[in-house]
Amino acid sequence: MKRPCEDSTSDSDMDETIDVGSENNYSGQSNGSFIRCGSPTTTSQVMARKKRRGIIEKRRRDRINNSLSELRRLVPTAFEKQGSAKLEKAEILQMTVDHLKMLQATGGKGYFDAHSLAMDFLSIGFRECLTEVARYLSSVEGLDSSDPLRVRLVSHLSSCASQREAAAMTTSIAHHQQALHPHHWAAALHPIPAAFLQQSGLPSSESSSGRLSEAPQRGAALFSHSDSALRAPSTGSVAPCVPPLSTSLLSLSATVHAAAAAAAAQTFPLSFPAGFPLFSPSVTASSVASSTVSSSVSTSTTSQQSSGSSSKPYRPWGTEVGAF
């Protein structure tokens, strides 16, 4: 009974010695497996590092692709070719380099101007539409290049494109000339000089509220002739007894007239008599006298004046300002 037990124990001892021998023989692999299995923090750090590296790489690729798409949209030659075929990244970069070289050669004139850039994109779009029309005629309609209808249509559209480009160049030149001389438009935005206001009888206060409240009393008489075409005839007197809304409109009209007169005087320095530059003293005195008489006469006289003014031809105030 004891021998089988001894045999079993000897077999187990043999197995144990074999296992120990195998561990000694493959100590490197066992130690490596023990380190990998025994340090979960190291494994998690490696996985987190790999994950972060993948996220960084994805962001870098997205940034490169977005920049290439922006270059394809901004460069005119790439924008012209993007509708017909898919551009490669190398082609987009090459077109960008060529475009920058051209800008450096020409000094960058006209490409940083919004008007010129818009006209450039407009001509490019027209050329792209011309290409699409030719492709449609050949693929859908079945018209070859020698067909007279296609030849006439394509030649007509090509001539239109050439004319549009020539007109765009002329417009861009005129636009640059206007940009170089902005004082024609900025003169109307400057405040009215005090000396000019004193000569014309307008108040020289700097506050806008005082100018708007006092302008109808002194300046409305100077422009009663031009404002009569704009105001509808009322049942009461003409100038002083208008409703409050008409008074505010009249003050704004007087201010606009004074600003336009100042702009015209600065733009076209003509020699006028003393007083208001655009009117002679006789016209000013007659207009003031007519406004004073119209404020003191009865309703019948007012109706006669309104009928007399209605019989006059329509003269908008824009024509009087534009005449100078």
Swiss-Prot record:
Composition bias type Low complexity, residue spans: 294-311
Principal location class: nucleus
Extent of the signal sequence: none
InterPro entries: bHLH_dom, HES_HEY, HLH_DNA-bd_sf, Orange_dom
One GO term describing the cellular component: nucleus
Keyword tags: Developmental protein, DNA-binding, Notch signaling pathway, Nucleus, Repressor, Transcription, Transcription regulation
Gene3D superfamilies, per database record: 6.10.250.980, Helix-loop-helix DNA-binding domain (4.10.280.10)
Name of this protein: Hairy/enhancer-of-split related with YRPW motif protein 2
Protein source organism: Danio rerio (Zebrafish)
Species lineage: Eukaryota, Metazoa, Chordata, Craniata, Vertebrata
